[in-house]
Protein backbone atom coordinates (compact mmCIF):
# COMPACT_ATOMS: atom_id res chain seq x y z
CA UNK A 1 0.00 0.00 0.00
CA UNK A 2 1.26 3.46 -0.91
CA UNK A 3 1.93 6.07 1.72
CA UNK A 4 -1.22 7.82 2.90
CA UNK A 5 0.51 11.02 3.96
CA UNK A 6 -2.18 13.64 4.69
CA UNK A 7 -2.39 16.11 1.82
CA UNK A 8 -4.34 18.74 3.72
CA UNK A 9 -6.54 18.80 6.83
CA UNK A 10 -9.51 16.48 7.10
CA UNK A 11 -11.89 19.44 7.11
CA UNK A 12 -10.77 20.18 3.58
CA UNK A 13 -11.16 16.71 2.17
CA UNK A 14 -14.79 15.89 2.91
CA UNK A 15 -16.46 14.43 -0.14
CA UNK A 16 -19.93 15.75 0.62
CA UNK A 17 -20.39 19.46 1.25
CA UNK A 18 -23.34 21.31 2.70
CA UNK A 19 -22.23 24.65 1.31
CA UNK A 20 -22.24 26.03 -2.20
CA UNK A 21 -19.41 28.34 -3.23
CA UNK A 22 -17.88 30.23 -6.17
CA UNK A 23 -21.35 31.56 -7.09
CA UNK A 24 -22.89 28.09 -7.10
CA UNK A 25 -20.67 26.76 -9.90
CA UNK A 26 -19.29 23.99 -7.69
CA UNK A 27 -21.37 21.44 -5.84
CA UNK A 28 -20.67 18.16 -4.16
CA UNK A 29 -24.34 17.27 -3.74
CA UNK A 30 -25.31 13.94 -5.33
CA UNK A 31 -28.60 13.90 -7.28
CA UNK A 32 -30.07 10.69 -8.66
CA UNK A 33 -31.25 11.23 -12.27
CA UNK A 34 -34.93 10.56 -12.88
CA UNK A 35 -35.83 7.08 -14.02
CA UNK A 36 -36.54 6.57 -17.70
CA UNK A 37 -37.85 3.57 -19.57
CA UNK A 38 -35.18 2.77 -22.17
CA UNK A 39 -36.37 1.51 -25.53
CA UNK A 40 -33.51 -0.27 -27.29
CA UNK A 41 -34.02 0.46 -30.96
CA UNK A 42 -30.83 -1.04 -32.43
CA UNK A 43 -27.78 -2.98 -31.36
CA UNK A 44 -25.37 -1.07 -29.15
CA UNK A 45 -22.90 -1.41 -32.03
CA UNK A 46 -24.41 1.71 -33.58
CA UNK A 47 -23.21 3.79 -30.67
CA UNK A 48 -20.35 1.94 -29.00
CA UNK A 49 -18.93 0.14 -32.04
CA UNK A 50 -17.36 -2.29 -29.60
CA UNK A 51 -17.88 -4.23 -26.38
CA UNK A 52 -17.28 -1.74 -23.59
CA UNK A 53 -16.85 -1.69 -19.84
CA UNK A 54 -20.42 -1.79 -18.52
CA UNK A 55 -19.78 1.05 -16.09
CA UNK A 56 -17.38 3.53 -17.67
CA UNK A 57 -15.20 3.49 -20.73
CA UNK A 58 -11.65 2.27 -20.39
CA UNK A 59 -9.14 5.10 -20.02
CA UNK A 60 -7.43 5.93 -23.30
CA UNK A 61 -3.64 6.25 -23.72
CA UNK A 62 -3.07 5.49 -20.03
CA UNK A 63 0.56 4.28 -20.28
CA UNK A 64 1.46 7.30 -22.40
CA UNK A 65 -0.21 9.68 -19.94
CA UNK A 66 1.76 8.28 -17.00
CA UNK A 67 5.03 8.27 -18.92
CA UNK A 68 4.70 11.85 -20.16
CA UNK A 69 2.98 13.42 -17.16
CA UNK A 70 5.68 12.01 -14.84
CA UNK A 71 3.66 12.14 -11.60
CA UNK A 72 5.87 12.35 -8.52
CA UNK A 73 5.18 10.63 -5.23
CA UNK A 74 3.39 13.04 -2.90
CA UNK A 75 2.77 15.68 -5.57
CA UNK A 76 -0.78 16.88 -6.28
CA UNK A 77 -2.18 16.10 -9.73
CA UNK A 78 -5.47 17.58 -10.92
CA UNK A 79 -7.51 15.07 -12.90
CA UNK A 80 -9.87 17.70 -14.23
CA UNK A 81 -12.27 15.27 -15.94
CA UNK A 82 -12.16 12.19 -13.74
CA UNK A 83 -15.10 10.36 -15.37
CA UNK A 84 -14.98 6.74 -14.24
CA UNK A 85 -11.74 7.22 -12.31
CA UNK A 86 -9.49 5.04 -14.45
CA UNK A 87 -6.81 7.67 -14.98
CA UNK A 88 -7.32 8.92 -11.42
CA UNK A 89 -6.64 5.48 -9.99
CA UNK A 90 -3.52 5.04 -12.13
CA UNK A 91 -2.16 8.39 -10.93
CA UNK A 92 -2.83 7.45 -7.31
CA UNK A 93 -1.14 4.08 -7.78
CA UNK A 94 1.91 5.92 -9.15
CA UNK A 95 2.25 7.62 -5.76
CA UNK A 96 0.76 11.03 -6.54
CA UNK A 97 -2.14 12.61 -4.66
CA UNK A 98 -5.10 13.63 -6.82
CA UNK A 99 -7.75 16.32 -6.91
CA UNK A 100 -10.46 14.72 -9.08
CA UNK A 101 -13.00 17.01 -10.74
CA UNK A 102 -16.05 16.28 -12.86
CA UNK A 103 -19.19 18.27 -13.58
CA UNK A 104 -21.29 15.09 -13.76
CA UNK A 105 -22.69 14.11 -10.33
CA UNK A 106 -22.93 10.50 -11.50
CA UNK A 107 -19.17 10.45 -12.09
CA UNK A 108 -18.50 12.17 -8.76
CA UNK A 109 -20.52 9.56 -6.89
CA UNK A 110 -18.85 6.69 -8.75
CA UNK A 111 -15.30 7.95 -8.23
CA UNK A 112 -15.94 8.80 -4.58
CA UNK A 113 -16.98 5.21 -3.93
CA UNK A 114 -14.42 3.56 -6.22
CA UNK A 115 -11.41 5.37 -4.80
CA UNK A 116 -12.44 5.66 -1.15
CA UNK A 117 -9.70 3.24 -0.11
CA UNK A 118 -7.06 5.85 -1.03
CA UNK A 119 -8.34 7.95 1.86
CA UNK A 120 -6.93 11.46 2.17
CA UNK A 121 -4.81 11.11 -0.93
CA UNK A 122 -7.79 11.80 -3.19
CA UNK A 123 -10.19 14.75 -3.10
CA UNK A 124 -13.30 14.51 -5.28
CA UNK A 125 -15.31 17.57 -6.26
CA UNK A 126 -18.19 18.24 -8.62
CA UNK A 127 -17.11 21.13 -10.81
CA UNK A 128 -16.51 21.96 -14.44
CA UNK A 129 -12.77 22.29 -14.94
CA UNK A 130 -13.25 25.86 -16.13
CA UNK A 131 -13.93 26.58 -12.43
CA UNK A 132 -10.89 24.69 -11.13
CA UNK A 133 -9.48 27.94 -9.78
CA UNK A 134 -12.42 28.24 -7.39
CA UNK A 135 -11.86 24.71 -6.12
CA UNK A 136 -8.15 25.28 -5.58
CA UNK A 137 -8.77 28.59 -3.85
CA UNK A 138 -11.34 27.01 -1.52
CA UNK A 139 -8.81 24.31 -0.64
CA UNK A 140 -6.00 26.82 -0.16
CA UNK A 141 -3.89 25.31 -2.95
CA UNK A 142 -1.85 27.73 -5.08
CA UNK A 143 0.02 25.44 -7.49
CA UNK A 144 -0.20 21.81 -8.56
CA UNK A 145 2.29 19.22 -9.79
CA UNK A 146 0.42 18.15 -12.91
CA UNK A 147 -2.87 18.34 -14.79
CA UNK A 148 -4.81 15.84 -16.87
CA UNK A 149 -7.74 16.63 -19.14
CA UNK A 150 -9.51 13.68 -20.79
CA UNK A 151 -12.21 15.28 -22.90
CA UNK A 152 -13.96 12.09 -23.96
CA UNK A 153 -17.60 11.35 -23.11
CA UNK A 154 -17.98 8.25 -20.95
CA UNK A 155 -19.69 5.01 -21.92
CA UNK A 156 -21.92 5.31 -18.89
CA UNK A 157 -23.23 8.66 -20.08
CA UNK A 158 -23.88 7.28 -23.55
CA UNK A 159 -25.54 4.12 -22.30
CA UNK A 160 -27.81 5.72 -19.69
CA UNK A 161 -30.97 6.55 -21.65
CA UNK A 162 -32.14 8.97 -18.95
CA UNK A 163 -29.22 11.30 -19.71
CA UNK A 164 -30.36 11.82 -23.30
CA UNK A 165 -27.01 11.29 -25.03
CA UNK A 166 -27.99 8.13 -26.87
CA UNK A 167 -29.38 7.81 -30.37
CA UNK A 168 -30.07 4.08 -29.94
CA UNK A 169 -31.87 4.16 -26.57
CA UNK A 170 -34.91 6.35 -26.10
CA UNK A 171 -34.80 9.02 -23.43
CA UNK A 172 -35.44 12.71 -22.85
CA UNK A 173 -33.60 14.99 -25.27
CA UNK A 174 -31.34 16.33 -22.51
CA UNK A 175 -27.55 15.84 -22.89
CA UNK A 176 -26.52 17.91 -19.87
CA UNK A 177 -23.33 16.76 -18.19
CA UNK A 178 -24.30 18.90 -15.20
CA UNK A 179 -28.05 18.45 -14.63
CA UNK A 180 -28.25 21.71 -12.66
CA UNK A 181 -27.68 23.79 -15.80
CA UNK A 182 -30.67 25.00 -17.82
CA UNK A 183 -29.90 24.51 -21.52
CA UNK A 184 -30.97 21.13 -22.92
CA UNK A 185 -30.78 19.54 -26.35
CA UNK A 186 -34.58 19.82 -26.60
CA UNK A 187 -34.34 23.59 -26.17
CA UNK A 188 -31.79 23.82 -28.97
CA UNK A 189 -33.67 21.53 -31.36
CA UNK A 190 -37.02 23.23 -30.79
CA UNK A 191 -35.98 26.88 -30.46
CA UNK A 192 -32.85 27.52 -32.55
CA UNK A 193 -33.51 28.95 -36.01
CA UNK A 194 -32.81 26.91 -39.12
CA UNK A 195 -29.69 29.00 -39.74
CA UNK A 196 -28.46 28.50 -36.18
CA UNK A 197 -29.00 24.75 -36.40
CA UNK A 198 -27.24 24.58 -39.75
CA UNK A 199 -24.22 26.42 -38.36
CA UNK A 200 -24.21 24.25 -35.24
CA UNK A 201 -24.33 20.94 -37.10
CA UNK A 202 -21.75 22.13 -39.63
CA UNK A 203 -19.23 23.58 -37.19
CA UNK A 204 -19.47 21.37 -34.11
CA UNK A 205 -20.73 18.24 -35.82
CA UNK A 206 -18.82 18.65 -39.07
CA UNK A 207 -21.98 17.27 -40.68
CA UNK A 208 -22.06 17.50 -44.52
CA UNK A 209 -25.87 17.42 -44.57
CA UNK A 210 -26.21 20.14 -41.92
CA UNK A 211 -28.64 22.34 -43.86
CA UNK A 212 -30.89 19.48 -44.93
CA UNK A 213 -31.10 18.17 -41.38
CA UNK A 214 -31.78 21.63 -39.94
CA UNK A 215 -34.52 22.22 -42.50
CA UNK A 216 -36.14 18.89 -41.64
CA UNK A 217 -36.06 19.60 -37.91
CA UNK A 218 -37.68 23.02 -38.32
CA UNK A 219 -40.38 21.53 -40.55
CA UNK A 220 -41.16 18.63 -38.20
CA UNK A 221 -41.17 20.63 -34.97
CA UNK A 222 -43.98 22.86 -36.27
CA UNK A 223 -46.43 20.02 -35.77
CA UNK A 224 -44.74 18.12 -32.95
CA UNK A 225 -41.79 19.38 -30.86
CA UNK A 226 -38.90 16.98 -30.34
CA UNK A 227 -38.79 15.76 -26.74
CA UNK A 228 -37.05 12.39 -26.97
CA UNK A 229 -33.88 11.10 -28.59
CA UNK A 230 -35.17 8.32 -30.83
CA UNK A 231 -37.67 10.38 -32.87
CA UNK A 232 -34.86 12.79 -33.74
CA UNK A 233 -32.39 10.02 -34.54
CA UNK A 234 -34.90 8.19 -36.70
CA UNK A 235 -35.85 11.34 -38.60
CA UNK A 236 -32.18 11.96 -39.43
CA UNK A 237 -31.68 8.33 -40.42
CA UNK A 238 -34.70 8.43 -42.73
CA UNK A 239 -33.41 11.62 -44.38
CA UNK A 240 -29.75 10.62 -44.76
CA UNK A 241 -29.89 6.85 -44.96
CA UNK A 242 -27.31 4.47 -43.52
CA UNK A 243 -23.83 4.27 -44.99
CA UNK A 244 -21.31 2.09 -43.16
CA UNK A 245 -21.21 1.40 -39.42
CA UNK A 246 -21.66 4.95 -38.14
CA UNK A 247 -25.20 5.93 -37.31
CA UNK A 248 -26.30 8.92 -39.44
CA UNK A 249 -27.29 10.87 -36.30
CA UNK A 250 -23.84 10.57 -34.70
CA UNK A 251 -22.49 13.97 -35.73
CA UNK A 252 -25.72 15.84 -35.01
CA UNK A 253 -25.90 14.37 -31.51
CA UNK A 254 -22.23 15.26 -31.00
CA UNK A 255 -22.92 18.87 -31.99
CA UNK A 256 -25.91 19.10 -29.67
CA UNK A 257 -23.92 17.67 -26.74
CA UNK A 258 -21.05 20.09 -27.31
CA UNK A 259 -23.44 23.05 -27.52
CA UNK A 260 -25.46 22.07 -24.44
CA UNK A 261 -22.30 21.79 -22.33
CA UNK A 262 -20.34 24.63 -23.98
CA UNK A 263 -17.47 22.20 -24.36
CA UNK A 264 -15.25 24.41 -26.53
CA UNK A 265 -15.80 27.49 -24.36
CA UNK A 266 -15.02 25.47 -21.25
CA UNK A 267 -11.84 24.14 -22.84
CA UNK A 268 -10.58 27.59 -23.83
CA UNK A 269 -11.26 29.01 -20.37
CA UNK A 270 -10.12 25.89 -18.54
CA UNK A 271 -6.72 25.79 -20.23
CA UNK A 272 -5.99 29.35 -19.09
CA UNK A 273 -7.18 28.68 -15.53
CA UNK A 274 -5.35 25.38 -15.14
CA UNK A 275 -2.01 26.35 -16.69
CA UNK A 276 -1.90 29.40 -14.41
CA UNK A 277 -1.88 26.98 -11.43
CA UNK A 278 0.77 24.64 -12.81
CA UNK A 279 4.06 24.69 -10.89
CA UNK A 280 7.29 25.27 -12.85
CA UNK A 281 8.53 21.96 -14.25
CA UNK A 282 5.08 20.36 -13.95
CA UNK A 283 3.17 19.16 -16.99
CA UNK A 284 -0.31 19.31 -18.45
CA UNK A 285 -1.64 16.46 -20.60
CA UNK A 286 -4.77 16.82 -22.73
CA UNK A 287 -6.59 13.99 -24.52
CA UNK A 288 -9.05 15.24 -27.14
CA UNK A 289 -11.43 13.36 -29.41
CA UNK A 290 -12.64 16.12 -31.74
CA UNK A 291 -10.71 18.13 -34.32
CA UNK A 292 -11.96 21.44 -32.92
CA UNK A 293 -10.87 20.47 -29.40
CA UNK A 294 -7.46 19.39 -30.65
CA UNK A 295 -7.09 22.66 -32.56
CA UNK A 296 -7.80 24.69 -29.42
CA UNK A 297 -5.21 22.71 -27.44
CA UNK A 298 -2.65 22.88 -30.25
CA UNK A 299 -3.04 26.65 -30.66
CA UNK A 300 -2.95 27.28 -26.90
CA UNK A 301 0.26 25.30 -26.47
CA UNK A 302 1.76 27.02 -29.53
CA UNK A 303 0.81 30.52 -28.34
CA UNK A 304 2.20 29.85 -24.86
CA UNK A 305 5.29 28.05 -26.20
CA UNK A 306 6.75 30.90 -28.26
CA UNK A 307 9.37 32.98 -26.50
CA UNK A 308 9.45 35.63 -29.22
CA UNK A 309 6.80 37.21 -31.42
CA UNK A 310 7.57 38.82 -34.76
CA UNK A 311 5.61 40.65 -37.44
CA UNK A 312 6.85 42.17 -40.71
CA UNK A 313 5.83 45.65 -39.58
CA UNK A 314 7.76 45.42 -36.30
CA UNK A 315 11.32 46.80 -36.20
CA UNK A 316 12.43 43.88 -34.02
CA UNK A 317 10.98 40.74 -32.43
CA UNK A 318 9.21 41.19 -29.10
CA UNK A 319 9.03 38.92 -26.09
CA UNK A 320 5.81 36.95 -25.82
CA UNK A 321 4.04 37.93 -22.56
CA UNK A 322 2.23 34.57 -22.56
CA UNK A 323 5.38 32.48 -22.89
CA UNK A 324 5.25 29.93 -20.08
CA UNK A 325 5.14 26.49 -21.72
CA UNK A 326 7.52 24.09 -23.44
CA UNK A 327 6.08 21.54 -25.85
CA UNK A 328 6.71 17.94 -24.81
CA UNK A 329 4.84 16.48 -27.80
CA UNK A 330 5.47 18.55 -30.96
CA UNK A 331 2.98 16.23 -32.66
CA UNK A 332 0.04 14.58 -30.89
CA UNK A 333 0.34 11.00 -29.72
CA UNK A 334 -2.34 8.57 -30.88
CA UNK A 335 -3.44 5.15 -29.60
CA UNK A 336 -1.54 2.13 -30.86
CA UNK A 337 -3.15 -0.25 -33.32
CA UNK A 338 -3.60 -2.74 -30.48
CA UNK A 339 -5.44 -0.20 -28.32
CA UNK A 340 -7.65 0.86 -31.20
CA UNK A 341 -8.61 -2.75 -31.87
CA UNK A 342 -9.34 -3.37 -28.19
CA UNK A 343 -11.19 -0.08 -27.73
CA UNK A 344 -12.54 1.37 -30.99
CA UNK A 345 -13.69 4.52 -29.17
CA UNK A 346 -10.03 5.44 -28.76
CA UNK A 347 -9.51 5.79 -32.52
CA UNK A 348 -9.91 9.56 -32.68
CA UNK A 349 -7.95 10.30 -29.48
CA UNK A 350 -4.99 12.69 -29.57
CA UNK A 351 -2.69 13.37 -26.63
CA UNK A 352 -0.75 16.62 -26.33
CA UNK A 353 1.57 17.45 -23.43
CA UNK A 354 3.33 20.66 -22.39
CA UNK A 355 5.57 21.62 -19.46
CA UNK A 356 5.40 24.81 -17.40
CA UNK A 357 8.68 26.70 -17.55
CA UNK A 358 7.96 29.62 -15.24
What residue spans do the PLM features occupy?
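S-adenosyl-L-methionine-dependent methyltransferase catalytic core, i.e., the SAM/SAH-binding region
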Residues: 2-5, 12-17, 21-358
